[in-house]
């Protein structure tokens, strides 16, 4: 006896409205919309469509801006749930039928998920495991005068400049971290510990 799929989609009022809007979308254009959203799903910081593209979608699907956003958000939510639960295509179709999505739209979801689902799940895994990658390291020394007029000693500070690559933005972000002598020494010791553990695994 087959185990029923966990309920991942519920018929809330907003879901019901979104389903009625999705059911009315031109079936010929719908698969391309799904493909685009699924391709960009793992890029949280990046919208699936530009403002200009959204205006074209409004005209193509005869939707108000608010309704278009509800449709796009609902499609993204359905696909995110599919990724999170790593559902099989047949289970996804069952879920979509439960929320009364028309058969042609449900089949478009299932076909898109069948061809791109596992690739998308893998992209999410990579994003969770390695959201940022260290690309560059720079450093400099700063000498700060003590605030007390009686204290003439300067306090040296090391400044590390880390260039990290974020997959969401595809751009290099510079992070500045300032260390006192003690903080840098503690940081060095932690790096030594990490290096020793890495060496023991290789």
Curated annotation (Swiss-Prot):
| Similarity remark | Belongs to the COMM domain-containing protein 10 family.
Which tissues and organs express this gene's product? Answer: Ubiquitous.
Q: Looking at the Swiss-Prot or TrEMBL record, what is one Pfam family this protein matches?
A: COMM_HN
Q: Does the keyword Transcription apply?
A: yes
Instruction: Provide the protein name.
Output: COMM domain-containing protein 10
**Subunit organization:** Component of the commander complex consisting of the CCC subcomplex and the retriever subcomplex. Component of the CCC (COMMD/CCDC22/CCDC93) subcomplex consisting of COMMD1, COMMD2, COMMD3, COMMD4, COMMD5, COMMD6, COMMD7, COMMD8, COMMD9, COMMD10, CCDC22 and CCDC93; within the complex forms a heterodimer with COMMD5. Interacts with RELA, RELB, NFKB1/p105, NFKB2/p100. Interacts with CCDC22, CCDC93, SCNN1B, CUL1, CUL2, CUL3, CUL4A, CUL4B, CUL7.
Encoding gene, per UniProt annotation: COMMD10
What keyword terms does UniProt attach to this protein? Acetylation, Cytoplasm, Nucleus, Phosphoprotein, Transcription, Transcription regulation, Ubl conjugation pathway
Q: Domain COMM: where?
A: 133-202
Record PTM N-acetylalanine, positions in chain: 2
Q: What does this protein do?
A: Scaffold protein in the commander complex that is essential for endosomal recycling of transmembrane cargos; the commander complex is composed of the CCC subcomplex and the retriever subcomplex. May modulate activity of cullin-RING E3 ubiquitin ligase (CRL) complexes. May down-regulate activation of NF-kappa-B.
